[in-house]
Amino acid sequence: MKQIYLKSRAKINLSLDVRRKREDGYHEVEMIMQQIDLYDNILIRERMDSEIVLSTNCIFIPTTSSNIAYKAAHKLKQRLDITRGIDIFIDKQIPVSAGLAGGSSNAAAVLMGLNHLWSLGLSTKELMEIGVTIGADVPFCLLGGTALAEGIGEVLTPINSDIKNTWIVLVKPAISVSTGDVYGSLDLSKIVDRPPTAQLLEAIKEGNIYDVSSKMCNVLETVTVNKYPIITEIKKKMMEYNALGAMMSGSGPTVFGIFKSYERAKSAYEHLSLFYKQSYMVQTYNGGTEIG
């Protein structure tokens, strides 16, 4: 039976602004998203029957039809009237419920993997159109690299970034945060500081990590930090260990710091990992989902 291996990469937000709440309940956002070299390994293998069977090494994610990667496979099969079945195995390395789009990345990898495995010939744009019906971050995870995301996150403008291979340290505290609860608690009238998106985009294009680090802003911190003071604690530690800037990614609770060199990132990682079990040292990545 045919099979395919994929690397399903995480993302961080270099900025996140919420512009308004729509009548359908969704929030319109303006955010800069950056792929990083932290990934889950995914194996997709054909089955003799028509079933979708998902398994994983992680006890914290479902293996039923509620799993976003399962939904991606089901949606693609349904859309193209495909009766073939598949096994999906997810070797989870990206922290769960962390603001890093781990689930969305898995869904994107499944869409891309099945497109390749079954020689469907769908374009990235067509895959993104399917992906947005599953989750707002799925289109970016298909695109990869660096992008400005607008709408509910599905309107993407690729950015010609010059901050390639920048060293990042991530810390995911031992708490879980509900994205829905964070957005539900956000009071748009009380947001004072918003990301200077145009200036950030210019700094990214110029490869100026000092300006990127100093101008990063996430308005969702106004909610999550108040509920979970540990996020502020981690940000302070990042700066003490020579980060150029530190910020919460997405709705949290993961905090990341940007470092100007491998040596400084490694030193910070070694110190932070003494306090926080889920600490990671990674780089920015610009290659999208990797097959094989």
Curated annotation (Swiss-Prot):
InterPro entries: GHMP_kinase_C_dom, GHMP_kinase_C_sf, GHMP_kinase_N_dom, IspE, Ribosomal_Su5_D2-typ_SF, Ribsml_uS5_D2-typ_fold_subgr. ATP binds at residues 95-105. GO terms for biological process: isopentenyl diphosphate biosynthetic process, methylerythritol 4-phosphate pathway; terpenoid biosynthetic process. Transmembrane segments: none annotated. It catalyses: 4-CDP-2-C-methyl-D-erythritol + ATP = 4-CDP-2-C-methyl-D-erythritol 2-phosphate + ADP + H(+). Pfam families: GHMP_kinases_C, GHMP_kinases_N. Gene3D superfamilies: 3.30.230.10, GHMP kinase, C-terminal domain. Pathway: Isoprenoid biosynthesis; isopentenyl diphosphate biosynthesis via DXP pathway; isopentenyl diphosphate from 1-deoxy-D-xylulose 5-phosphate: step 3/6. GO terms for molecular function: 4-(cytidine 5'-diphospho)-2-C-methyl-D-erythritol kinase activity; ATP binding. The active site is at 11, 137. The keyword Kinase applies. Keywords: ATP-binding, Isoprene biosynthesis, Kinase, Nucleotide-binding, Transferase. Its EC number is 2.7.1.148. Catalyzes the phosphorylation of the position 2 hydroxy group of 4-diphosphocytidyl-2C-methyl-D-erythritol. Belongs to the GHMP kinase family. IspE subfamily. This is 4-diphosphocytidyl-2-C-methyl-D-erythritol kinase. It comes from Alkaliphilus oremlandii (strain OhILAs).
